[in-house]
Amino acid sequence: MTKSSELYQKAQQTIPGGVNSPVRAFNGVGGSPLFIERADGALIFDADGRAYIDYVGSWGPMILGHNHAVIREAVIDAAQRGLSFGAPTEMEIAMAELVSELVPSMEQIRMVSSGTEATMSAIRLARGFTGRDKIMKFEGCYHGHADSLLVKAGSGALTLGQPSSPGVPADFAKHTLTATFNDLDSVRELFAANKGEIACIIVEPVAGNMNCIPPVEGFHEGLREICDQEGALLIFDEVMTGFRVALGGAQAHYNIKPDLTTLGKVIGGGMPVGAFGGRKEVMQYVAPTGPVYQAGTLSGNPVAMAAGFACLNLLKEEGNEKRLASKTKQLADGFKSLAEKHGIPLVVNQVGGMFGFFFTDQETVTCYEDVTKCDIERFKRFFHLMLDHGVYLAPSAFEASFTSLAHGSKEIDATLEAADRCFAIIAAEAK
């Protein structure tokens, strides 16, 4: 038995399922999860001392690579001055100014401690600003585990085969309308049936919680137009796409200006940070300037702000955005080419520094229904084969994977060499 397996058994005695977030349990792929001891650059090292090329990146935050020296020193320096004050700091101003510089639609910003907190707060704000109760999301998209959002949710809920969660009252869920991603007609139908009642649309601009699904041409433009016509706010949930799809997020990549944006993951440089922000007139409704209450003991934590500030300043250096997208495209194209070589039907999607692949003979995968038609069992087999070859992909067919600036030619080439061997095994098994 490996040390990871031993630790997993031990963890289950005191931690539900042995993990502190469900997807980590490997339920989506089977087997025992790896317990990680340390990480550096593009590599993670498990409790047994084995190294893996990492394409999970702590589920997205590690865009510069693991254990980056500059971020590490920023954390140490901040920690030496105190871990938490519960009072304003100058670094919070610097951080807000930097985020607003990179994402201009965020004229004002409120820092929080997680992506879930950010989306939950943004939706409360949208309801308070518009005076409406209903919200619209998309099937297969995931916006955190707030009660009103666990309605046909993606990510962990899809991985576990549970489209909604027990414990969410029907009275909460009834205010959440669910449309079809990449289908504007479904959006229009819901607005027509709920005239003057919908406060906002919240959307992952690239759906990263049913693997990786970009918008079809005109989808986001259509959402913007519909929201303007109906007096609803458009919320881009950029917890995953922010600073990763492009330096200015998916909204910069697709040239769309949302009313509100939520951020997480990359913004903290590996520390627990989230944020929401947008038009000043909307953000002025947040307490203490407005009536919509939102608060947090650790919001704007000085150590977390220092990590995020260091991360974003490094990330915005010239050439980094293009370099990240280029190496991710190289990897995605390589997966597609190798699958074709071995006669394995595969759809590969990639935007900026995120990518995903689907074992399917469909020409495209553009919505949740398409995802459900993919070969999940084949994904599980491929995942474990790649793991055996030293490559750590997201342990779920419903999760996107991520590259970092620390992934160089050596890591990309080694990954594709492993994929070549793994596709060959799968092709042989299918004969």
From Swiss-Prot:
Pfam families per the UniProt record, alphabetical: Aminotran_3 (PF00202)
Swiss-Prot/TrEMBL keywords: Cytoplasm, Isomerase, Porphyrin biosynthesis, Pyridoxal phosphate
Entry GO terms, CC: cytoplasm
GO molecular function, a single term: pyridoxal phosphate binding
Sections of the chain in a coiled coil: none
Claim: Isomerase is one of the keywords in the record: yes
Gene3D superfamilies cross-referenced by the UniProt entry: Aspartate Aminotransferase, domain 1 (3.90.1150.10), Type I PLP-dependent aspartate aminotransferase-like (Major domain) (3.40.640.10)
EC annotation from Swiss-Prot or TrEMBL: 5.4.3.8
Pathway(s) of this molecule: Porphyrin-containing compound metabolism; protoporphyrin-IX biosynthesis; 5-aminolevulinate from L-glutamyl-tRNA(Glu): step 2/2
Location(s), subcellular: Cytoplasm
Enzyme class: isomerase
Catalytic activity: (S)-4-amino-5-oxopentanoate = 5-aminolevulinate
GO-annotated biological processes: protoporphyrinogen IX biosynthetic process
Main location: cytoplasm
Cofactor: pyridoxal 5'-phosphate
NCBIfam families recorded: hemL (TIGR00713), PRK00062.1 (NF000818)
HAMAP family linked: HemL_aminotrans_3 (MF_00375)
Record note on quaternary structure: Homodimer.
Stated family: Belongs to the class-III pyridoxal-phosphate-dependent aminotransferase family. HemL subfamily.
Record-given protein name: Glutamate-1-semialdehyde 2,1-aminomutase
Organism, as annotated: Vibrio parahaemolyticus serotype O3:K6 (strain RIMD 2210633)
Gene that this polypeptide is encoded by: hemL
